[in-house]
């Protein structure tokens, strides 16, 4: 037998074990860094640099605007296809009112309406989200006033293409809609 293992009761094996434990656990072990009151008194570990970087990216105005643009495009496309599906005039030719439209014509009209709605919803979503993020960054607060201000700016910008009165109505209407939505979602 090898001479490295000592018989029980001599104490040499205990010494080796305690040296190994001291090396692995002793003063070489770092305590886990925690934030004392992170979640209402529950200690939470400190975030790594990668987590902090991802939070900064996801909280940026550009990311929020891009996310709202993509979400608006998808939602608008679905809404456009749905409204085209229930519209009785899809594929209708006013020159020949008695002709039944073909499936290809109906699908083409549904696709065109879906794409039109998708682009409009994407633009409005990106404008509103970016404006709200910029207003929130400027004010330094996250409350209902941000959505009302950004709703007014977005509605006004969309409405001013049709004139001053339309811009004022767009500002008021979009701000009121934003206030109602914010009231129910917060």
UniProtKB/Swiss-Prot annotation:
The intrachain disulfides are: 61-133, 152-171
A GO term (biological process) for this protein? Answer: protein insertion into mitochondrial inner membrane
As for membrane topology, the entry says: Multi-pass membrane protein
- Write out the entry's keywords from A to Z: Disulfide bond, Membrane, Mitochondrion, Mitochondrion inner membrane, Protein transport, Translocation, Transmembrane, Transmembrane helix, Transport
Organism's domain of life?
Eukaryota
Question: Where, per UniProt, does this protein localize?
Answer: Mitochondrion inner membrane
Q: Which residues cross the membrane?
A: 66-86, 117-135, 162-182
Keyword Transmembrane helix in the entry? The reply is: yes
Kindly provide the name given to this protein in its UniProt entry. Mitochondrial import inner membrane translocase subunit Tim22
Gene name linked to the record: timm22
């Amino acid at each position: 037998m090898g001479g490295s293992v000592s018989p029980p009761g001599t104490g040499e094996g205990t010494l080796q074990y305690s040296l190994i434990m001291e090396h692995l656990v002793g003063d070489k072990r770092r305590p886990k860094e925690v934030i004392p009151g992170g979640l209402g008194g529950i200690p939470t570990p400190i975030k790594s640099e990668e987590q902090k970087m991802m939070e900064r990216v996801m909280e940026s105005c550009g990311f929020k605007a891009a996310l709202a643009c993509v979400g608006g495009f998808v939602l608008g496309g679905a809404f456009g296809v749905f409204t085209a599906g229930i519209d009785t005039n899809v594929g209708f030719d006013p020159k020949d009112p008695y002709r039944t439209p073909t499936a290809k014509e109906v699908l083409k009209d549904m696709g065109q309406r879906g794409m039109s709605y998708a682009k409009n919803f994407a633009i409005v979503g990106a404008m509103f989200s970016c404006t709200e993020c910029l207003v929130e960054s400027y004010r330094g607060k996250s409350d209902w006033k941000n959505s009302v201000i950004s709703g007014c700016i977005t509605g006004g910008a969309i409405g001013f293409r049709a004139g001053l009165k339309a811009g004022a109505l767009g500002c008021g209407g979009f701000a009121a809609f934003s206030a109602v939505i914010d009231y129910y979602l917060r």
